[in-house]
């Protein structure tokens, strides 16, 4: 038997096995990535419930009713000892004329979030109240630089006449030990997670994918009624805990 014939026979046996292994590991990796995003969404939904679970330690109802966008970043962790060594990933949605928008995945880097040195994690919630929040949220900027940010007030019964709305565009909350508290996150960098958006949104002519700034702007201005199933827990939690997504 010639060397060529032997090689051809071997290749017909080995090549299918290599193709199978390649497909197996690719699908396994994609599945793991999908599970990771699902857990991120589910945890963000839980954080919103925890945010309002203790009335005396929850954001004022008046503030939540005025929210134009809400971002939740669970499990921000300290990844280094210096400033800027903290990072976390979550998602955001904005109020539209008819409901909460298609969400976008986002990330926060730097800042303090109320964390202490030692690897502690914190859940962070940002409440946007400026009317142009959708445009702002679809860009990369520094909190406190590109947009004013302040520690959020607490107490569900704070009057709607309170002047908090005149002082800042974004109000921030962090929970690192038990209850939420208002925390100043000035200096934190807001980023868009295009890679996660590409994994979550299908290629479809009638839906943006959030894989660039323009597309994220489209996400945050499009009603989330047709959002992929992965986002359902988060959108339902927004309605239940923050309020309807319609604009007043």
Q: Residues of each region from the PLM?
A:
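N-terminal secretory signal peptides that target proteins for export/translocation
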Residues: 1-10
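Bacterial N-terminal signal peptides
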Residues: 13-26
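Signal peptide processing junction and immediate N-terminal pro/mature segment
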Residues: 26-32
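Small-residue-enriched, tightly packed secondary-structure blocks
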Residues: 32-248
């Amino acid at each position: 038997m010639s060397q060529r014939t032997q090689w051809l026979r071997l290749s017909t046996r080995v090549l299918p096995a290599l193709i199978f292994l390649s497909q197996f590991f690719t699908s396994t990796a994609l599945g793991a990535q999908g599970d990771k995003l699902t857990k991120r969404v589910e945890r963000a939904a839980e954080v919103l419930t925890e945010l309002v679970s203790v009335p005396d330690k929850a954001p004022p109802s008046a503030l939540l009713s005025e929210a134009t966008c809400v971002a939740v970043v669970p499990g921000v962790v300290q990844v280094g000892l210096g400033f800027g060594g903290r990072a976390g990933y979550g998602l955001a949605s904005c109020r539209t004329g008819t409901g909460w928008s298609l969400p976008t995945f986002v990330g926060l880097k730097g800042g303090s979030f109320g964390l202490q040195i030692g690897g502690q994690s914190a859940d962070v919630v940002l409440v946007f109240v400026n009317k142009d929040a959708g445009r702002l949220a679809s860009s990369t900027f520094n909190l406190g630089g590109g947009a004013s940010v302040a520690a959020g007030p607490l107490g569900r019964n704070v009057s709607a006449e309170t002047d908090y709305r005149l002082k800042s565009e974004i109000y921030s909350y962090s929970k690192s030990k038990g209850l939420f508290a208002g925390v100043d996150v000035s200096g934190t960098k807001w980023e868009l997670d295009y890679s996660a958006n590409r994994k979550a949104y299908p290629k479809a002519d009638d839906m943006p994918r959030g894989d660039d700034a323009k597309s994220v702007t489209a996400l945050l201005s499009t009603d989330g009624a047709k959002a992929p199933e992965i986002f359902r827990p988060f959108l339902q939690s927004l309605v239940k805990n923050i309020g309807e997504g319609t604009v007043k």
